[in-house]
């Protein structure tokens, strides 16, 4: 049987470019482990920070080094020129995080190519990226969430008479502390925890510079726990993991600085809470029309035994030390087998 050619697509234009390189390197290693070399050949395809696609030795070198290529602004012609290796791909494994990678835009392009790909489609990716659309989907599915308010940039920037009223509403409905989040950025980029009116005004202005849509959530004193989901129509949930960190909240620095955050797998939780979180993770996955993989994040309030869904990540970090593969390793699915299963799920979904 001929080996499948896996297009490992990495890099991208978002601020999570470097995270993507590390994820891709780990996946490439997994594709060269166990029985995978008998099944798959890797075609590395690197998207530079300017959006230009590279293949061959250039892409392989970036994959080996996990360091981005320097680049200049690209022309329209360069952006619409794909390497010839693209036509050789049997199945895509896109591992681009953030905007233009996991928000449905790339998934739309791969759908037009009529080639199967790992992960959610256009709808699941788009809903899973936009925190406001995601919350609406969760609400429709009856999943408990913390209180929130959704606003847009125009409410913050357009009229000096409107902005104070907006801040009044946030204070009255949510109180302090609360979190201000751009709706469409990953890795906690642009998120601020605020405790006063002045901090709120500053955080809203900052979030509006990142995104047109902004969500403000009430703060809760809770443990942050995560569950991995794997599958298509009949997904499975992993054991639960917990994140603890040495910062005010789980921000970008805490996520990507060694020693600032610790993963506890499995999390020490009552059995009933574990089952509840696993069930909610699968419900959330189905609510956004997920496929292949997702990591679902929760708040567990120990005092009241309440569980609130925080968000879903349809293309989570995939380094050997990332939460998603670690959760499956603890559940009994090692890294190389996990990568194989994801490729098979992509092929199954295309049939």
Swiss-Prot record:
Q: What is its EC number?
A: 6.3.2.4
Where along this sequence does the record place binding of Mg(2+) 1? 297, 311
Pathway assigned in UniProt: Cell wall biogenesis; peptidoglycan biosynthesis
Domain of life assignment: Bacteria
Q: Where is the ATP-grasp domain?
A: 135-344
Q: Name one GO molecular function term.
A: metal ion binding
Q: Which cofactor does it need?
A: Mg(2+); Mn(2+)
Concerning SUPFAM superfamilies, the annotation shows: Glutathione synthetase ATP-binding domain-like (SSF56059), PreATP-grasp domain (SSF52440)
Ligand binding (ATP): 171-226
**GO annotation, biological process:** cell wall organization; peptidoglycan biosynthetic process; regulation of cell shape
- Keyword ATP-binding present in the record's keywords: the answer is yes
Q: Which Gene Ontology terms of cellular component type are present?
A: cytosol
Q: Where does Mg(2+) 2 bind?
A: 311, 313
What keywords does the record list, in alphabetical order?
Answer: ATP-binding, Cell shape, Cell wall biogenesis/degradation, Cytoplasm, Ligase, Magnesium, Manganese, Metal-binding, Nucleotide-binding, Peptidoglycan synthesis
Q: What class of enzyme is it?
A: ligase
The similarity annotation says: Belongs to the D-alanine--D-alanine ligase family.
**PANTHER family named in the record:** D-ALANINE--D-ALANINE LIGASE, D-ALANINE--D-ALANINE LIGASE A
Kindly provide the name given to this protein in its UniProt entry: D-alanine--D-alanine ligase
Q: Which organism is the protein's source?
A: Rippkaea orientalis (strain PCC 8801 / RF-1)
């Amino acid at each position: 049987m001929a080996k499948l050619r896996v297009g490992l697509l990495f890099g991208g234009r978002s601020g999570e470019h470097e995270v993507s390189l590390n994820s891709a390197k780990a996946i490439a290693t997994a594709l060269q482990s166990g029985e995978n070399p008998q099944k798959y050949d890797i075609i590395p395809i690197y998207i530079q920070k300017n959006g230009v696609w590279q293949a061959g030795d250039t892409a392989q070198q970036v994959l080996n080094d996990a360091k981005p290529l320097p680049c200049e602004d690209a022309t329209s012609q360069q952006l619409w020129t794909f390497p010839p290796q693209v036509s050789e791909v049997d199945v895509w494994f896109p591992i681009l995080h953030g905007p233009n990678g996991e928000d449905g835009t790339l998934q739309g392009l791969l759908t037009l190519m009529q080639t199967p790909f790992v992960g959610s489609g256009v709808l699941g990716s788009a809903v899973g990226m936009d925190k406001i659309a995601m919350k609406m989907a969760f609400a429709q599915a009856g999943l408990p969430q913390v209180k929130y308010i959704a606003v847009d940039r125009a409410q913050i920037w357009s009229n000096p008479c409107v902005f104070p009223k907006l801040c009044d509403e946030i204070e009255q409905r949510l109180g302090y502390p609360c979190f201000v989040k751009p709706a469409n950025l990953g890795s906690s980029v642009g998120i601020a925890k605020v405790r006063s009116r002045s901090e709120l005004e500053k955080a809203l202005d900052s979030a509006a510079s990142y995104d047109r849509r902004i969500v403000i959530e009430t703060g809760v004193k809770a443990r942050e726990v995560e569950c991995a989901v794997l599958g298509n129509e009949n997904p499975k949930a992993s054991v639960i993991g917990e994140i603890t960190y040495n910062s005010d909240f789980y921000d970008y620095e805490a996520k990507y600085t060694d020693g600032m955050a610790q993963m506890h797998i499995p999390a020490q939780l009552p059995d009933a809470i574990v089952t509840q979180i696993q069930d909610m993770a699968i419900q959330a996955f189905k609510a956004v029309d997920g496929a292949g993989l997702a990591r679902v994040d929760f708040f567990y309030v120990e005092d009241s035994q309440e569980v609130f869904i925080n968000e879903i990540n349809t293309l989570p970090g995939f380094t050997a030390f990332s939460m998603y593969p670690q959760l499956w390793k603890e559940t009994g699915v090692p890294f190389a087998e996990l990568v194989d299963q994801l490729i098979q799920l992509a092929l199954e979904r295309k049939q």
